[in-house]
Swiss-Prot record:
This is Dynamin-like GTPase OPA1, mitochondrial. Residues 88-96 are mitochondrial matrix. Residues 501-504 are annotated as: G5 motif. The lineage of its organism: Eukaryota, Metazoa, Chordata, Craniata, Vertebrata. Dynamin-related GTPase that is essential for normal mitochondrial morphology by mediating fusion of the mitochondrial inner membranes, regulating cristae morphology and maintaining respiratory chain function. Exists in two forms: the transmembrane, long form (Dynamin-like GTPase OPA1, long form; L-OPA1), which is tethered to the inner mitochondrial membrane, and the short soluble form (Dynamin-like GTPase OPA1, short form; S-OPA1), which results from proteolytic cleavage and localizes in the intermembrane space. It comes from Mus musculus.
């Protein structure tokens, strides 16, 4: 009822609105009116022929009695005939965005409420700790009032200062990585840093290696590495020297270099170097003077030599052997104090401690290099030149110290080797022996004095030097004992002169100037000099150096001309022998012969490129067919020929050819090409060159050939390219002309006839000689051959009955043959029947195939026209044509690889081998041998020695 009353009130309101709206102009937009007002407006203005558009949504017709449900009604804009249509897409977009905002806002409110509720739940789960507040002291709550944190922060160091004090992690990481690489490199010294297991399985004890052993092992390994690089450096220096010679030889004629004048002592040192090599090669000893420094180990030999050279140039050790090979030191005067080795151009500045350390290290490396494995000392000499202001000109040789006992770590023959080296130098009648004796030890412990007295019993070329006189004066109770030594009354030896020197306080870091000052100060204050036990000219190393130099040059002037005359006589004898034995040959030493042989070998390698392509392809094709013919006939042709029709034959052939090409054929082809290249290379290297052929190079050429072939490897990609080419060649079945057809038939006949001949020989060996050979050569058959002959005859009868018999015998056929033979009294085994059948059927098949081959000579027309004739199927001819074409294409491909790539690579290998042989002196001595080579070597050495001696003698006379 209340709804009906409410509707009636609404109708009255509407009617009143209509009455008052009669004055509204008609141009008022209808869209601005309310929906209800629009319906009233249209009912009172029928002149407006408005067309109501169809609503897109279902709706209800409203009246005054119906309920207005505006939230369910969706109206669309109304089109009027006189008003254009308007599009309100911004309004629709805004409405959608407003709806999205409400969704987001609602979600945010709901999420915040949920988060607050979760936080409250967690807060309620935390226990209340207010009851335990009494445990904390009261001053804790007031501590911030008494502590000024700002002052503490200022008192602490800054972050930059802390960073500067911190270790450099990059450097530490780099050092650790270097140590890790060093210890994991598999070096021999690696085990020194590992614990050694000495316990049982249950209880293991580890023993740590001492620091000294670790350092020694590291130094040993470092020295080995340096020795290796030292060899490389020497080889490079040798190459540089050879290149320098070549540059000088190719100098322009218009440019003349000024010849540097060498000093007298340098010329003499070069003579000694050449003589040293000559003596080592021919086990002889020259008689030119040199100062030989000998003494007991740790007697001070090296220190005396360093005082004379005015530089600490030798490695030093505390009581251990440091001089492991003779060191020849040539002293000469010069503006700068420098040292250099004979075989190196590097100069060491002896005024700089860095260069001195490098020189000592270099000498130690050279000594270790000279010492062979299993030895302690070496007789090979290290040549060193020292120049400086105030140095006395002479040549000294520092020898290893004489020992009395061989200690652990030394070779068993160390003592004898040192004695033999010392005797070899002291046996020279013109050598000056500088005998060094330690004054701080008892004279009875001396070993070297006995050795010197044996070599120079009259003391005509011996100078005695007493070292460590300062220690001797302190330790010896009777000073007269030192006087007896200096006067030559204590030791059983004689000498030209006696000297007393002081070579330092025992500190290896002392400089030469400090040692000289200490020596002069000691002798100025010494009781020995004040009491006239020692004379002034017998003390200090300076006086010793002057005396040794005077004695040295006196010996040189007396003996050098005699030595030159002896070499002149030797040269005359060698030249006479050469003229009598080799009058038409030039005198070529081993190096010159090697260069000549090198040029000949390279010319012969170049000859490989002169081989014609036709010759390459012929020998390649022939060699390849010889290698693969057995496989083609036995594994491809014969199995396929047993088939009944041409389709099966072609299928079998294609399958077997594909398998053969994929697996074996390319590899076989490369092997054949490599063997062919070797044969041609050997032919050029070994073929005689007529009367001009020199057999002295034969061993060298053979060695170069073998080493080059060993190093040469065929290109790895050759097989892959060959496989594709061979596969494509075998796939082709179209024979284009009659000439190719005839060539294939000839190729097939030749192959089958060769197999037939082999089969005939096998049958002949099986059945024995025929009646003609038995009568003419008196040969008989064995019992087994008779059985084979009877079996063969029986099987041939079977083949005559059935000309198209398959390749295998059936079991009943074997039984029939055996019964027939037994009926004639021949006992035969089934396996013997099968073996005989194999050869008999093989001969029958090959003869049939040859007859068929003759028939196919006229079959090219049928093949070309594709006629189907069962009596004339020439598929086997096509097979052999495919094989022949594959061989030709393969030979052509291999020839291109040979001429374009492999010959050049072989030539490169030959050059590398020759370069390696040129650097290996032992290899040249082994390969270039003979009386002629040795005689030329002797002539070259003797001429060089004589020329240097003559130049030295001339300069010596000019100096006089």
């Amino acid at each position: 009822m209340w709804r009906a009353g409410r509707a009636a009130v609404a109708c009255e309101v509407c009617q009143s609105l209509v009455k008052h709206s009669s004055g509204i102009q008609r141009n008022v937009p209808l869209q601005k009116l309310h929906l209800v007002s629009r319906s009233i407006y249209r009912s009172h203005h029928p002149a407006l022929k408005l067309q109501r558009p169809q609503l897109r949504t279902p709706f209800q017709q409203f009246s005054s009695l119906t309920h207005l449900s505006l939230h369910k009604l969706k109206l669309s804009p109304i089109k009027y005939g006189y008003q254009p249509r308007r599009n309100f897409w911004p309004a629709r977009l805004a409405a959608r965005l407003l709806k999205l905002r409400y969704i987001i806002l609602g979600s945010a409110v709901g999420g915040g409420y949920t988060a607050k509720k979760t936080f409250d739940e967690w807060k309620d789960m935390i226990p209340d700790l207010s009851d335990y507040k009494w445990i904390v002291p009261d001053f804790i709550w007031e501590i911030d009032e008494y502590i000024d944190l700002e002052k503490i922060r200022k008192a602490l160091p800054s972050s930059e200062d802390l960073a500067s004090l911190a270790p450099d992690l990059d450097k530490i990481t780099e050092s650790l990585s270097l140590l890790k690489d060093f210890f994991t490199a598999g070096s021999p010294g690696e085990t020194a840093f590992r614990a050694t297991d000495h316990g049982s399985e249950s209880d293991k004890h580890y023993r740590k290696v001492s620091d000294k052993e670790k350092i020694d092992q590291l130094q040993e390994e470092l020295l080995h590495t340096q020795l290796k690089y030292q060899r490389i450096l020497e080889r490079l220096e040798k190459e540089n020297k050879e290149l320098r010679k070549l540059v000088l030889q190719k100098d322009d004629k218009g440019i003349h270099h000024r010849k540097l004048k060498k000093s007298l002592i340098d010329m003499y040192s070069e003579v000694l170097d050449v003589l040293s090599d000559y003596d080592a090669s021919y086990n002889t000893q020259d008689h030119l003077p040199r100062v030989v420094v000998v003494g007991d180990q740790s007697a001070g030999k090296t220190s005396v030599l360093e005082m004379i050279a005015q530089a600490r140039i030798f490695p030093r050790g505390s009581g251990e052997m440091m001089t492991r090979s003779p060191v020849k030191v040539t002293l000469s005067e010069g503006p700068h104090h420098v040292a250099l080795f004979k075989d190196s151009s590097r100069e060491f500045d002896l005024t700089k401690e860095e260069d001195l350390a490098a020189l000592r290290h270099e000498i130690e490396l050279r000594m270790r290099k000279n010492v062979k494995e299993g030895c302690t000392v070496s007789p090979e000499t290290i040549s060193l030149n020292v120049k400086g202001p105030g140095l006395q000109r002479m040549v000294l040789v520092d020898l290893p110290g004489v020992i009395n006992t061989v200690t652990s770590g030394m070779a068993p023959d160390t003592k004898e080797t040192i004695f033999s080296i010392s005797k070899a130098y002291m046996q020279n009648p013109n050598a000056i022996i500088l005998c060094i004796q330690d004054g701080s030890v008892d004279a009875e412990r001396s070993i070297v004095t006995d050795l010197v007295s044996q070599m120079d019993p009259h003391g005509r070329r011996t100078i005695f030097v007493l070292t460590k006189v300062d220690l001797a004066e302190k330790n010896v109770a009777s000073p007269s004992r030192i006087q007896q030594i200096i006067e030559g009354k204590l030791f059983p030896m004689k000498a030209l002169g006696y000297f007393a020197v002081v070579t330092g306080k025992g500190n290896s870091s002392e400089s030469i100037e400090a040692i000289r000052e200490y020596e002069e100060e000691f002798f100025q204050n010494s009781k020995l000099l004040k009491t006239s036990m020692l004379k002034a000219h017998q003390v200090t190393t300076r006086n010793l150096s002057l005396a040794v130099s005077d004695c040295f040059w006196k010996m040189v002037r007396e003996s050098v001309e005699q030595q030159a005359d002896s070499f002149k006589a030797t040269r005359f004898n060698l030249e006479t022998e050469w003229k009598n034995n080799y009058p038409r040959l030039r005198e070529l030493d081993r190096n010159e012969l090697f260069e000549k042989a090198k040029n000949e070998i390279l010319d012969e390698v170049i000859s490989l490129s002169q081989v014609t392509p036709k010759h390459w392809e012929e020998i390649l094709q022939q060699s390849l067919w010889e290698r693969v013919s057995t496989h083609v006939i036995e594994n491809i042709y014969l199995p396929a020929a047993q088939t009944m029709n041409s389709g099966t034959f072609n299928t079998t052939v294609d399958i077997k050819l594909k398998q053969w090409t994929d697996k074996q054929l390319p590899n076989k082809a490369v092997e054949v090409a490599w063997e062919t290249l070797q044969e041609e290379f050997s032919r050029f290297m070994t073929e005689p060159k007529g009367k001009e052929h020199d057999d002295i190079f034969d061993k060298l050429k053979e060695a170069v050939k073998e080493e080059s072939i060993k190093r040469h490897k065929w290109n790895d990609f050759a097989e892959d390219s060959l496989r594709v080419i061979q596969h494509n060649a075998l796939e082709d079945r179209s024979i284009s002309d009659k000439q190719q057809w005839d060539a294939a038939i000839y190729f097939m006949e030749e192959a089958l006839q060769g197999r037939l001949k082999d089969t005939e020989n096998a049958i002949e060996n099986m059945i024995g000689p025929d009646w003609k050979k038995r009568w003419m050569y008196w040969k008989n058959r064995t019992q087994e051959q008779c059985v084979h002959n009877e079996t063969k005859n029986e099987l041939e009868k079977m083949l005559k009955v059935n000309d198209e018999h398959p390749a295998y015998l059936a079991s009943d056929e074997i039984t029939t043959v055996r019964k027939n033979l037994e009926s004639r009294g021949v006992e035969v085994d089934p396996s013997l029947i099968k073996d005989t059948w194999h050869q008999v059927y093989r001969r029958h098949f090959l003869k049939t195939a040859l007859n068929h081959c003759n028939l196919c000579r006229r079959g090219f027309y049928y093949y070309q026209r594709h006629f189907i004739d069962s009596e004339l199927e020439c598929n086997d001819v096509v097979l052999f044509w495919r094989i022949q074409r594959m061989l030709a294409i393969t030979a052509n491909t291999l020839r291109q690889q040979l001429t374009n790539t492999e010959v050049r690579r072989l030539e490169k290998n030959v050059k590398e081998v020759l370069e390696d042989f040129a650097e290996d002196g032992e290899k040249k001595v082994k390969l270039l041998t003979g009386k002629r080579v040795q005689l030329a070597e002797d002539l070259k050495k003797v001429r060089e020695i004589q020329e240097k001696l003559d130049a030295f003698i001339e300069a010596l006379h000019q100096e006089k």
